[in-house]
Swiss-Prot record:
<dbReference type="InterPro" id="IPR016039">
    <property type="entry name" value="Thiolase-like"/>
</dbReference>
<dbReference type="GO" id="GO:0102452">
    <property type="term" value="F:bisdemethoxycurcumin synthase activity"/>
</dbReference>
<dbReference type="InterPro" id="IPR001099">
    <property type="entry name" value="Chalcone/stilbene_synt_N"/>
</dbReference>
<feature type="active site" description="Acyl-thioester intermediate">
    <location>
        <position position="174"/>
    </location>
</feature>
<dbReference type="InterPro" id="IPR011141">
    <property type="entry name" value="Polyketide_synthase_type-III"/>
</dbReference>
<keyword id="KW-0808">Transferase</keyword>
<dbReference type="GO" id="GO:0009813">
    <property type="term" value="P:flavonoid biosynthetic process"/>
</dbReference>
<dbReference type="GO" id="GO:0042802">
    <property type="term" value="F:identical protein binding"/>
</dbReference>
<keyword id="KW-0284">Flavonoid biosynthesis</keyword>
<protein>
    <recommendedName>
        <fullName>Bisdemethoxycurcumin synthase</fullName>
        <ecNumber>2.3.1.211</ecNumber>
    </recommendedName>
</protein>
<dbReference type="InterPro" id="IPR012328">
    <property type="entry name" value="Chalcone/stilbene_synt_C"/>
</dbReference>
<dbReference type="GO" id="GO:0016747">
    <property type="term" value="F:acyltransferase activity, transferring groups other than amino-acyl groups"/>
</dbReference>
<dbReference type="Pfam" id="PF02797">
    <property type="entry name" value="Chal_sti_synt_C"/>
</dbReference>
<comment type="subunit">
    <text>Homodimer.</text>
</comment>
<dbReference type="GO" id="GO:0030639">
    <property type="term" value="P:polyketide biosynthetic process"/>
</dbReference>
<comment type="function">
    <text>Plant-specific type III polyketide synthase (PKS) that catalyzes the one-pot formation of the C6-C7-C6 diarylheptanoid scaffold of bisdemethoxycurcumin by the condensation of two molecules of 4-coumaroyl-CoA and one molecule of malonyl-CoA.</text>
</comment>
<comment type="pathway">
    <text>Secondary metabolite biosynthesis; flavonoid biosynthesis.</text>
</comment>
Length: 402
């Protein structure tokens, strides 16, 4: 006999109540929007900019080394919220030892919601329904620590209902975009009629600092990361107005064993700091296939094998070296990571927002290629971050992508 509960004089079957509260179909990506600050710096000019604003032009050998690093990043340009004028007004930002976290957080408290809102407005416009129809809001950032936070600020900025159900995620690093979408899938599938707005926004101002002759990590971070925000609307059981792009078939997360030393972050009185170890690409290359098989093997029909090339790929472009490792480990054909490499080239690594940029670029490339021939219907969206954590989802591309 099915469990029941008594409400007043009526008897309600709990199983029927639960089914009525859940969506019938899979959660899907219904719209995507992205945004960047207006300040664009090319990779070619960045070493001169960086050493000038940090008063480090006298470190000629280190500057030459940094130029070589920038040339090997696979990055052509990046967008930055911080400008030369801002850094001149805040000399503590370029002093590696000066306490400056409060000033950075105060700037981020306004800049992050504004950038996030710009991306979200684009997603809502593409979606085609009123902002007031958003039922849930999931926001993720590494750039801030104010409460009320970015999620709260977005309610009036976007015209969301005061009753929108908000969730704020902090310090998930580069896997944050996938983690937020994974949460959105659960919300959409377990709440009939839910429409979840996911926003990831990042500012490199949180960890900008001057060069250190004894710290290669500083040069790597300053030459790789950029600023950006990405927004996605997720929902199940699309109505006649909505055009689902990617159904989220499955979502999973796992940890690479004995890797927590390789990549981590923490707030100090100076800035957001952490460890970005040289072993990160190798750890990903050695473990990515096993992680994917553990997460999606049964859904993909077993052991992967050459089947990895039968999928499309939206991989977080943490660096060109990381993508080279993924290519090699999975035996991917040339061009399989073209969307991710394009995003790295055009924007740099924007932490949690980057993988959503890659998904957006992938749908553009799919639209261009659809008329030319076959394109896989199934694909993987995947990101890596502190832990080390691998967060991924199996996607099904709908006809609306074309």
């Amino acid at each position: 006999m099915a469990p029941t509960t008594t409400m007043g004089s009526a008897l309600y079957p709990l199983g029927e109540m639960r089914r009525s509260q859940r969506a019938d179909g899979l959660a899907a990506v219904l719209a995507i929007g992205t945004a960047n600050p207006p300040n664009c710096v090319t990779q070619e000019e960045f070493p001169d900019f960086y050493f000038r604003v940090t008063n480090s032009d006298h470190l000629t050998a280190l500057k030459d080394k940094f130029k070589r690093i920038c040339q090997e990043m696979g990055v052509q340009r990046r967008y930055l919220h911080h400008t030369e004028e801002m850094l001149s007004a805040h000399p503590e930002f370029v002093d590696r030892d000066a306490p400056s976290l409060d000033a950075r957080l105060d700037i981020a408290a306004d800049a992050v919601p504004e950038l996030a809102a710009e991306a979200a407005k684009k997603a809502i416009a593409e979606w085609g329904r009123p902002a007031a129809d958003i039922t849930h809001l999931v926001v993720t950032t590494n750039s801030g620590a104010h409460v009320p936070g970015v999620d709260f600020r977005l309610v009036p900025l976007l015209g969301l209902r005061p009753s929108v159900r908000r969730t704020m995620l902090h310090l998930n690093g580069c896997f944050a975009g996938c983690a937020a979408l994974r949460l959105a899938k659960d919300l959409a599938e377990n709440s009939r009629g839910a429409r979840v707005l996911v926003v990831a926004a990042e500012l490199t101002l949180m960890y900008f600092t001057g060069p250190d002759e004894g710290c290669f990590r500083t040069l790597l971070v300053q030459g790789l990361f950029g600023d950006g925000a990405a927004a996605v609307i997720v929902g199940a059981d699309a109505d006649d107005v909505e055009r689902p792009l990617f159904e989220i078939v499955s979502a999973a997360q796992t940890i690479i064993p004995e890797s927590d030393h390789a990549l981590n972050m923490r707030f100090t009185e100076r800035r957001l700091d952490g460890v970005l170890g040289r072993q990160v690409p190798g750890l990903i290359g050695d473990n990515v296939e096993r992680c994917l098989l553990d997460m999606f093997g049964p859904l993909l029909g077993g052991d992967g094998g050459g089947g990895w090339n039968d999928l499309f790929w939206a991989v977080h472009p943490g660096s060109s070296t990381i993508m080279d490792q993924v290519d090699a480990a999975l035996g991917l054909e040339p061009g399989k990571l073209a969307a991710s490499r394009r995003v790295l080239s055009d924007y740099g690594n924007m932490s949690g927002a980057t993988v959503i940029f890659a998904l957006d670029e992938l749908r553009r490339q799919r639209k261009e290629a659809a008329a030319a021939g076959e394109w896989p219907e199934l694909g993987v969206m995947m990101a890596f971050g502190p832990g080390m954590t691998v967060d991924a989802m199996l996607l099904h591309a709908t006809s609306h992508v074309n």
